[in-house]
């Protein structure tokens, strides 16, 4: 039986994603290999520096106070502990960081509080 590469490629081209997944699993079992990407040989410290680290510190940025400015000022005061004048100045000067270098859960809670007050805000 002669191997016809073109026929094989045509058959692969007509397969669905599920069929291709099953094919990969069968090849892995048959030949004892893995479809996982291998690390390039000889990649030293330069490759290690290229690894993307998961971000652990987040900033909550107030983009706009919206129509409920008083509610947003109250929320900013609660989140930051600032006085009334400082919180008003922060809100008036948007876009500004409300909280900086905080954990993801804290950033999400602060964002939720600002959004509920009527502000436009985001996490960076």
Swiss-Prot record:
Signal sequence coordinates: none
Superkingdom of origin: Bacteria
Claim: Ribonucleoprotein is one of the keywords in the record: yes
Pfam families for this protein: Ribosomal_L12, Ribosomal_L12_N
GO CC terms in record: cytosolic large ribosomal subunit
Single GO biological process annotation from the record: translation
Gene3D superfamilies (alphabetical): 3.30.1390.10, Single helix bin
InterPro entries assigned: Ribosomal_bL12 (IPR000206), Ribosomal_bL12_C (IPR013823), Ribosomal_bL12_C/ClpS-like (IPR014719), Ribosomal_bL12_oligo (IPR008932), Ribosomal_bL12_oligo_N_sf (IPR036235)
Keyword terms: Ribonucleoprotein, Ribosomal protein
MF term (GO), any: structural constituent of ribosome
Keyword presence, Cytoplasm: no
Annotated family: Belongs to the bacterial ribosomal protein bL12 family.
HAMAP family in alphabetical order: Ribosomal_bL12 (MF_00368)
Role description: Forms part of the ribosomal stalk which helps the ribosome interact with GTP-bound translation factors. Is thus essential for accurate translation.
Assembly mode: Homodimer. Part of the ribosomal stalk of the 50S ribosomal subunit. Forms a multimeric L10(L12)X complex, where L10 forms an elongated spine to which 2 to 4 L12 dimers bind in a sequential fashion. Binds GTP-bound translation factors.
UniProt protein name: Large ribosomal subunit protein bL12
């Amino acid at each position: 039986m002669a191997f016809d590469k073109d026929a094989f490629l045509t058959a692969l081209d007509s397969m669905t994603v599920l069929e291709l997944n099953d094919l990969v699993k069968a090849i892995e079992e048959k030949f004892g290999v893995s479809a996982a990407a291998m690390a390039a040989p000889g990649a030293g410290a330069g490759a290690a520096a290229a690894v993307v680290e998961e971000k652990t510190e987040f900033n909550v940025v107030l983009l706009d106070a919206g129509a409920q400015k008083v509610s947003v000022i109250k929320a900013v005061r609660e989140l930051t502990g600032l006085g009334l004048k400082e919180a008003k100045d922060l809100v008036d000067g948007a876009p500004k960081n409300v909280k900086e270098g905080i954990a993801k859960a804290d950033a999400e809670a602060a964002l939720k509080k600002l959004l509920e007050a009527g502000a436009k805000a985001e996490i960076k």
